[in-house]
């Protein structure tokens, strides 16, 4: 049955992805809902909510506000909030409610800017898609709104696509900046995870952009078209703290001749999964994901899952010797008898790596 889940919990939706991108940019983030969606974002999908301050609020829509489309009341609420809070911009994130009533996001953005004098952007998420779709829209809108012409700084790179939903279960926040700084880049900017809105404004100064998740590709393409900034899809395998040990464990099970005969499945977001595949060049490895997959990076045998039943059937019909995936997915395939190596994906399980 389509949409039926007996083993897997619901994955993070698009509005959570939008909020994850904007969380560290010192903006006033309004979830356009009655309260439930904002509660899910802060309570389940945004781990930084418990560790740092971020102005994420519910619009608190009432029945008649939604039915009559009282955008003026929302704008009035936002204006009052801005009198008490300092924000560099205002973001309104959509949910199923505005999708159903047909909210005019462009008009809403203009009304907010006129009322407050603060830059506003709106993200037309609708709660029916997954987190990566919301991230994709938000990254692109953010750079379209704020990035301006700048002279290129040699040795400066920008990292696009990092959020806790992509990596929150497996790495420390400053890992990517440290990793690329050690690769002789003079300045490393990680948008949304360590670097704020000023970095977005200066995005054109980057000599190159590194895209670490599929959700960042649309923004990287925009920056390439607008400012000529080249980009590369890459996510270092060392982002997984135990990767060296896990790689040695897998290699220890198999010698070089056996490796080419064994089937391995890696399940995560596509950029990271592809990077891990390259670590075992001689092996028969397929990449799978529940989230967007870039056609240019997708190999013939790679697979995109949509339903829980798709996952169960696929594992039954394909005898993999090793699976590298979030442990939550293992619950749906108790019959699997091969080797399983945990690779956390926060958007799937909501689980973070336990500090040792």
Give each language-model segment a name:
Residues 1-356:
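An N-terminal assembly and electron-transfer interface module characteristic of large anaerobic redox
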């Amino acid at each position: 049955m389509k949409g039926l889940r007996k083993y897997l919990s619901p994955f993070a939706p698009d509005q959570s992805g939008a909020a994850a991108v904007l969380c560290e940019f010192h903006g006033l983030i309004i979830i356009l809902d009655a309260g439930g969606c904002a509660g899910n974002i802060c309570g389940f999908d945004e781990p930084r909510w418990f560790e740092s301050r971020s102005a994420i609020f519910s619009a608190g829509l009432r029945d008649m506000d939604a039915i009559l489309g009282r955008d003026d009341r929302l704008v009035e609420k936002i204006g009052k909030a801005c009198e008490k809070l300092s924000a560099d911009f205002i973001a309104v994130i959509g949910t199923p409610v505005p999708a159903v009533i047909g909210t005019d996001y462009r008009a809403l953005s203009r009304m907010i800017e006129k009322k407050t004098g603060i830059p506003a952007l709106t993200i037309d998420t609708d709660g029916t898609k997954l987190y990566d779709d919301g991230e994709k829209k938000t990254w692109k809108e953010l750079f379209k709104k704020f990035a301006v012409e700048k002279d290129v700084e040699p040795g400066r790179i920008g990292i696009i696509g990092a959020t806790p939903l992509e990596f929150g279960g497996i790495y420390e926040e400053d890992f990517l900046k440290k990793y690329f700084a050690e690769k002789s880049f003079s300045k490393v900017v990680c948008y949304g995870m360590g670097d704020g809105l000023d970095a977005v404004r200066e995005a054109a100064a980057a000599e190159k952009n590194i895209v670490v998740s599929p959700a960042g590709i649309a923004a990287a393409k925009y920056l390439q078209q607008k400012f000529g900034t080249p980009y590369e899809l890459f996510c270092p395998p060392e982002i997984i703290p135990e990767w060296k040990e896990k790689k040695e464990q897998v290699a220890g099970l198999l010698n070089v001749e056996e490796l080419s005969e064994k089937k391995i499945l890696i399940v995560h977001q596509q950029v990271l999964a592809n990077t891990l595949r390259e670590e075992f060049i001689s092996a028969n490895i397929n990449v799978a994901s529940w989230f967007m997959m870039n056609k240019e990076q997708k190999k013939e045998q790679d697979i995109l899952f949509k339903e829980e039943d798709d996952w169960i059937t696929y594992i039954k019909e394909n005898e993999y010797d090793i699976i590298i995936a979030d442990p939550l997915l293992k619950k749906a395939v108790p019959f699997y008898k091969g080797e399983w190596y945990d690779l956390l994906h926060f958007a799937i399980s909501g689980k973070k790596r336990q500090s040792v």
